[in-house]
UniProtKB/Swiss-Prot annotation:
The gene is RPL16A. It is found in: Cytoplasm. It comes from Saccharomyces cerevisiae (strain ATCC 204508 / S288c). Signal peptide: none annotated. CDD domains: Ribosomal_L13. InterPro entries: Ribosomal_uL13, Ribosomal_uL13_CS, Ribosomal_uL13_euk/arc, Ribosomal_uL13_sf. This is Large ribosomal subunit protein uL13A. The modification N-acetylserine is found at S2. N-terminally acetylated by acetyltransferase NatA.
Length: 199
């Protein structure tokens, strides 16, 4: 298997556990991975049931000193990270090195907004869940248990989408111009003479 310098995965529409298992395996193989738009990750099952599960997790704490953990992270990026950490032997040197190859973000911060993003088909909700099954968005769950930055991320994402659309429109116009210029050059008399001479 060839290792890319960095693979950027767009988390939107992926199931948390399935994506985590694929990413964990690649990290252990030496691949650097960045997961963006963690707030758009999905969990199967209705919102209320997943919220109850998270509240059950909130009750788990050290009896005599709560600061000793377990720590209940609310941000979508940290919830995904914790799910993935359980799939890696994170207390060994190999596991620690693997987790250092991972970055998880809400939204798509620079410089990853300019990088090519990929999806993982075996973790996509539309391919894995039966149509009509209920699912929860990680951002919604996080907000319901105390994550405060959903509005901030949404605002930044809206700005990014506008600039991305502008860039794409410019790129498409430029490609069209290049194609028409090439077509014109191919039809010119000089091009025909060169073609006759075998060039």
């Amino acid at each position: 298997m060839s290792v890319e310098p960095v693979v950027v995965i767009d988390g939107k529409g992926h199931l948390v556990g399935r994506l985590a298992s694929v990413v964990a395996k690649q990290l252990l193989n030496g691949q650097k991975i960045v997961v963006v738009r963690a707030e758009e990750l999905n969990i199967s099952g209705e919102f209320f049931r997943n919220k109850l599960k998270y509240h059950d997790f909130l009750r788990k704490a050290t009896a005599f000193n709560k600061t000793r953990g377990p720590f209940h992270f609310r941000a979508p990026s940290r919830i995904f990270y914790k799910a993935l950490r359980g799939m890696v032997s994170h207390k060994t040197a190999r596991g620690k090195a693997a987790l250092e190859r991972l970055k998880v973000f809400e939204g798509i911060p620079p410089p990853y907004d300019k990088k090519k993003r990929v999806v993982v088909p075996q973790a996509l909700r539309v391919l894995r869940l039966k149509p009509g099954r209920k699912y929860t968005t990680l951002g919604k769950l996080s907000t319901s248990v105390g994550w405060k930055y959903e509005d901030v991320v949404a605002k930044l994402e809206a700005k990014r989408k506008v600039s991305s659309a502008e860039y794409y429109a410019k790129k498409r116009a430029f490609t069209k111009k290049v194609a028409s210029a090439n077509a014109t050059a191919a039809e010119s008399d000089v091009a025909k003479q060169l073609a006759a001479l075998g060039y």
